[in-house]
């Protein structure tokens, strides 16, 4: 299942099995999407914040790549609602890279409990008014997930990375998390192997 709120980009993906042509948020709403046509993958529900560009090692000559070229209003819904609408009852793997909206997406997870979650986390956000990274991690802990790994993304000029991909799995230290893993043992092992968390 792919999520793509920009109509022109969603049309390019029409040959895929499931495309959700909406934005994801913590509730059904309308949000403004700030589009960076020079760097579409960096489009966001939040406006870029060039004060932090230096921390991401973005040179001034590249600032134009991160300039908002247009903005559109997009229909947003929760992830759980959209998955139910296409009759997907179970989610094994969830990857979230939404340039700041990761926490809002996770708040819309409903009763879905993936066995493997990969989420982009900014320690120093490139966007204005993005919730602090620790709120995202705390939310996942409240959903009974634990952080097992992170990998630095891109370049940065700080001693700790400006942004990372973090991997979360069900909390194996309690009965609920352990049971979720056991029920999906083969899938869990496969995902752990694919993402280099286990060695044969």
Question: Residues of each region from the PLM?
Answer:
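Phosphate/nucleotide-binding beta-alpha loop and adjacent structural elements of enzyme active sites
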Residues: 1-200
